């Protein structure tokens, strides 16, 4: 459908708040349990079937990117690469007589688990891109289950510690020359988009409903203004103070109503 554009496909990402009705996983703490890459590496037959399907669909094209969810160690990336290479060579052999070409896909990982924030240089040696999963990263950094009504009020992507972590990620990614994208609620919110632009993120993944609003907003501000706003946010002591700075700035730009409605 889009042979000239990169197509990113994520390997099976279930568990936690993404259950499969035909593959029930009963755990006392599912968010810290058997989910994402942990599950599929324990079941390489599932991983290989999915990767083979991705590769089959990409025969004759060169735009496939495979993304691994819930990575927490370098060894998980290494084992995933081994299995992807196995599938690649299997499919290559199967189509050898057809004259068709199979290109090796680019490989990326989701940055959702805090441990990987401290191993980005090591991980950069094994992958082609990073993608920050801000929703899960926020709940792990703040130790908050966002689906638990008793503590959901503590979940906030504008917590200064979360903003600091997101800033560190893009700085380290740039230092290691690895492209980085970010997805999650904050990327599709006007206030969040401004802060992320100030940090250095240039690829924001969001719901299609938010695209026009965010596109319109970023045309109304400069990068220098985003950086100044970020500086105030990073030195704040709470998310409430962050929002005070955001609202004050945006009111001066005549954009306060937009942010209050979308933040």
Model-derived features: where do they sit?
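Conserved alpha/beta-domain cores
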Residues: 1-263
